[in-house]
Swiss-Prot record:
One of the record's GO cellular component terms: extracellular region
InterPro entries per record: Mcrtin_ACTH_cent (IPR013531), Melanocortin_N (IPR013593), Opioid_neuropept (IPR013532), PMOC (IPR001941), POMC-derived_peptides (IPR050878)
Pfam families xrefs: ACTH_domain (PF00976), NPP (PF08384), Op_neuropeptide (PF08035)
Organism of origin: Acipenser transmontanus
Alphabetized UniProt keyword annotations: Amidation, Cleavage on pair of basic residues, Disulfide bond, Endorphin, Hormone, Pyrrolidone carboxylic acid, Secreted, Signal
Name of the protein in question: Pro-opiomelanocortin
Signal peptide: 1-25
Length: 263
């Protein structure tokens, strides 16, 4: 059974021989590769071949674009992108392989999907309550710009006028007995006085009806002067001026005289 070191040496030599075959066997012609009896000579030959390949020959001779890149170059290229890191272990050390990173991501996904149902429902209820609170705040903000939204300050009460001349003190501040006495002290018209007041108005209405014309004396259009009725257009023939008609006849007569002279 071969030693692990010799197995690695044989594998590396095979790779170098495969790559060096396309560059006219420059590696095997090197002076350090003629004596391969010892392990030190083999390592020196490998080092010399690597230097020759990197300095004189391309990385992939022939159809190099169809061949996969080496692991070193692939790692160098992938180190510049964030997806080169496939997660971290639980103890804080970076993941060793893609499979470990994928398993870590899968475990995180399973933990997120396996949350209790009550927590999800509670989160949804909190979100709905927050949205409702935002809608209420927006509605109250818009209603503040109108007078029916929120009254500004204290509502002003109407001023009450009392017949006894006391306006500063309200009658509601008095006790019930005093308020009753105040109401009894008010001077209300008696029956005879009411008959005199309404009797005089009835006599006036009867006189107006006897004349045959009922006029609304409380309004300005009850009886306007004749010269101002309908803007002065409803005047009689006698009241109107005769000058426009005389001027018309005069103009007609002058026109007829000119026509006869022309003939």
């Amino acid at each position: 059974m071969l030693h692990p070191v010799w197995g690695c040496v044989v594998a590396v030599m095979g790779v170098l021989w495969f790559y060096s075959s396309g560059v006219q066997s420059q590696c095997w012609e090197h002076s350090q590769c003629r004596d391969l009896a010892s392990e030190a000579n083999i390592l020196e030959c490998i080092q010399a071949c690597k230097v020759d390949l990197s300095a004189e020959s391309p990385l992939f001779p022939g159809n190099g674009h169809l061949q996969p890149t080496s692991e070193d170059i692939q790692n160098y290229v992938m180190s510049h992108f964030h997806w080169n890191t496939f997660g971290q272990r639980m103890n804080g050390t970076p993941g060793g392989s893609k499979r470990e990173g994928a398993s870590t991501a899968l475990s995180v996904l399973l933990e997120a999907l396996s949350q209790p149902r009550d927590e999800v429902e509670r989160e949804s209820e909190e979100e709905e309550g927050l949205q409702q609170h935002r809608r209420d705040d927006k509605r109250s903000y818009s209603m503040e710009h109108f007078r029916w939204g929120k009254p500004v300050g204290r509502k002003r009460r109407p001023v009450k006028v009392y017949p006894n001349g006391v306006e500063e003190e309200s009658a509601e501040s008095y006790p019930a007995e005093i308020r009753r006495d105040l109401s009894l002290k008010l001077d209300y018209p008696q029956g005879e006085e009411l008959e005199e007041v309404f009797g005089g108005e009835n006599d006036l209405l009867n006189l107006q009806k006897k004349d045959g014309s009922y006029k609304m004396n409380h309004f300005r259009w009850s009886g306007p002067p004749k010269d101002k009725r309908y803007g002065g257009f409803m005047k009689s023939w006698d009241e109107r001026s005769q000058k426009p008609l005389l001027t018309l006849f005069k103009n007609v007569m002058i026109k007829d005289g000119h026509e006869k002279k022309g003939q």
